[in-house]
Amino acid sequence: MVSATTQLKLRAADGKKYNTDVLDAKGIVLLAKSVSNQRAMAFLDWLTYSDSTLDGQSRKKAYALFESKLIDSIPVGTVKGLQQIHSLLFGGLYDFAGKIRTKTISKGGFTFCLHEYLPKQLEIVERMPETTFDEIADKYVEMNVCHPFMEGNGRATRIWLDLMLKARLQRCVDWSKINKNDYLQAMTLSVADATRIKTLLQGALTDRINDREMFMKGIDYSYYYEQQE
């Protein structure tokens, strides 16, 4: 908005409208740089797409995934499709991008599918039906339990979920409607009971499946979910 705005009129207490001072894009950048704060710098990186961290570079790749239309060629609901998403997000950043892990990993005291059983379990998940919302959500939850990659599972799998919803139900998730902590807690609980994550996802469904803004916003929130507070 600030990039396209040169002047703005607001109504004052006397009932008259006056021109206000506004900042153009360059001014916003200078303002953010003047604030000695980690969050301000993170905002600046987001605004200018200049984040040189691994996550920042991967996020740019995610944007390009939509802009290039590569996303339309990914096989939906398959392990191969998920590997392609992961490779496109993390290629050149991780040497294991798109590769199924060969080690067992854990997080927060929970051990994901043991690596020796992972190939077979992935075959089982791939064969799960995906014709209804409940089936798609169950498939997403089971793929999360598999956690097929060493890193980057959540970011890749959320796109994988949206592609299934788009192809089968003509819907996708408006991730901006799902609170980060609520989502993380629901995913933790989903190992035993998927009710909570299904409620969150269903409440955030939208038919804006071809909306560029919706996809880009979803990417921003997806990467935000992974940030350490």
Cite the ranges covered by each PLM segment.
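Acidic, carboxylate-rich catalytic segments that either coordinate divalent cations
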Residues: L93, D182, M187-E229
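N-terminal structured helix/loop subdomain that forms the ligand-binding/catalytic interface
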Residues: S36-G91, D95, M164-W175, Q227
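Catalytic DNA-binding helix-loop module of base-excision-repair DNA glycosylases/AP lyases
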Residues: E135-L169
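Short coil/turn segments at secondary-structure boundaries
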Residues: L44-W46, F96-I105, N153, K198-Q202, ...
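An anion-engaging/catalytic patch
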Residues: M1-D51
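Helix-hairpin-helix/helix-loop-helix acidic hairpins
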Residues: G109-H147
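Active-site substrate-recognition loop segments, prototypically the cytochrome P450 B′-helix/B-C loop
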Residues: L88-Y94, K99-F112
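Substrate-binding beta-hairpin/strand module that engages nucleic acids
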Residues: S3-Q7, D174-D182
